[in-house]
A protein has these predicted regions:
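Short acidic, Pro/Gly- and aromatic-enriched capping/linker segments at domain boundaries
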Residues: 21-26, 250-267
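Bacterial Sec-dependent N-terminal signal peptides
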Residues: 1-23
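Short loop/turn motifs at secondary-structure junctions
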Residues: 139, 154, 273, 338-339, ...
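Short Pro-Gly-centered flexible turn/kink motifs
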Residues: 92-98, 264-283
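Polysaccharide-binding surfaces and accessory modules of carbohydrate-active proteins
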Residues: 23-36, 45-244, 260
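Aromatic-lined carbohydrate-binding/catalytic grooves of carbohydrate-active enzymes
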Residues: 304-426
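Terminal connector regions
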Residues: 279-310, 317
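Short coil/turn motifs at secondary-structure junctions
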Residues: 148, 281-282, 398-400
Length: 426
């Protein structure tokens, strides 16, 4: 009887241990926000909660869901995948299982969490990495992908993050525009299907749209009330923010580098790190989200963000290409009298053989124009010093006009496709 009792006790302890492991809870917290993951009985990592702060007891009480933390291609998952890879042997499927988690406090404000996931068949690893900024209520998330397969792995999709929501409605605010009409705010109610905010323009990724959004979970977004998620991708190149409402009215947000024409050959032992998505949740409307990002940017995102910025006067709208030393000296004097701290000389100051009198010539010839500035740039620098303000100058070194001395001497320096006419757009 004692033996049977011991066996029963061991069995119960084993069941308890398995249950505890299966429901391991990982909380990523700020002062007012919690993002919670759990490991289910199959060792799959699930997102179970993202919202207002939950203490440890409340976090443990959350229920396991079917929401994949980082969904992959080639499994039973049929929505947009965060990861799609072709392994060294040609296998197109990846299935990730929970391996472990590390949490370290980097400072009073920052906690770093690294969750390791591994494929069940290949030596292929994905690390979901987070920095939670407690006082600013911002979470920074990125992914690190590596492997030790015998041959390279080709990555086709490699998202920075995947966020899951189950709400009655979703209102998305995006920011888009064009030259001279930037950052227009447009709100749309999401319906079943996929809405992509994206750019394929490479280094000009912000020209028509911007990698940031608001998501309202309580009807149309409000400035001072309502549950709102705000996010921005810290990446200057081609990007995609994908918002997919599935057949159960769940919303999946996948953020990262645009996979369009962006496959990456990942060699063994190499680590591919994605850009980070910065995001925040608030129950107090878009204004609260905006101020959180302002505070975060001033402290962590901008060089000398805690310092007062220099006030400057730029001559572009006042003169365009039509100016000379006398005109610019007058603007410098007026700028100083009005309390500006810096004068910035804009386009039109350079090129002689093909003067920069319009946007059709001169780019690439970075010598001052002797007709407009007979005494050189040093004269304007000294004029600024006399008035007690700094001097700055505009350059566009990555561009060239065909009508320029630089292009005449080095046409081979221009980026283009062989046997194709040049694309002369800016």
């Amino acid at each position: 009887m004692k033996t049977l009792g011991r066996q029963m006790l061991c069995y119960l302890l084993l069941c308890f241990a398995v249950t505890t492991y299966a429901e391991e809870t990982i909380s990523i917290d700020t002062d007012n926000t919690s993002l919670i993951y759990k490991v289910d009985k199959d060792k799959k990592l699930r997102q179970v909660y993202f919202g207002s702060f939950l203490d440890a007891k409340e976090a443990e009480a959350t229920q396991v869901t079917k929401a994949d933390a980082y969904p992959t291609f080639g499994t039973s998952y049929v929505n947009e995948a965060a990861l799609r890879a072709v392994h060294g042997d040609g296998n197109t499927s990846t299935e990730l299982y929970f391996e472990g988690v590390e949490q370290n406090k980097l400072s009073d404000d920052i906690t770093q969490t690294i969750i390791t996931l591994k494929d069940g068949c290949f030596p292929f690893t994905v690390k979901l990495c987070f920095k939670s900024y407690a006082q600013n209520d911002v979470i920074e998330q990125w992914s690190e992908i590596s492997h030790t397969e015998k041959k390279p792995v080709t990555l086709y999709n490699y998202a920075s993050s995947h966020l899951f929501f189950n709400e009655p409605s979703y209102y998305l605010t995006q920011f888009c525009g064009e030259w001279a009409m930037e950052m227009n705010m447009v709100e749309t109610q999401l319906s079943r299907g996929v809405k992509n905010l994206e750019s394929k323009l490479g280094v000009r990724s912000n020209q028509h749209s911007h990698p940031c959004f608001y998501l309202s979970l309580d009807g149309k977004a409000q400035e001072k009330a309502g549950r709102v998620v705000g996010g921005t991708l810290a990446w200057p190149g081609s990007y995609r923010l994908s918002f997919e409402v599935d057949h159960r009215e769940n919303l999946h947000i996948i953020s990262g580098i645009n996979p369009y024409a962006s496959q990456y050959i990942l060699n063994p032992k190499e680590v591919f790190r994605t850009p980070a998505l910065l995001y925040s949740y608030s129950s107090k409307g878009t204004g609260d989200i905006s101020r959180r990002f302002h505070r975060w940017a001033k402290k962590y995102g901008i060089y000398r963000g805690d310092k007062t910025r220099t006030t400057l006067l730029n001559n572009w709208e006042a003169t365009y290409f039509d100016f000379n030393e006398e005109v610019l000296s007058g603007i410098i004097k007026d700028a100083a009298d009005m309390g500006f701290e810096l004068f910035l000389l804009d386009d039109g100051w350079f090129a002689n053989k093909y003067p920069r009198d319009n946007d059709k010539a001169g780019l690439g010839d970075w010598n001052y124009n002797k007709k407009k500035l007979p005494h050189g740039l040093g004269y304007l620098v000294n004029e600024s010093k006399k008035k007690g303000i700094k001097f700055g100058i505009w350059l566009e070194p990555e561009m060239v006009n065909p009508k320029s001395e630089l292009y005449e001497k080095h046409p081979d320096w221009v980026i283009g496709q062989p046997n194709r006419p040049l694309d002369l757009s800016r």
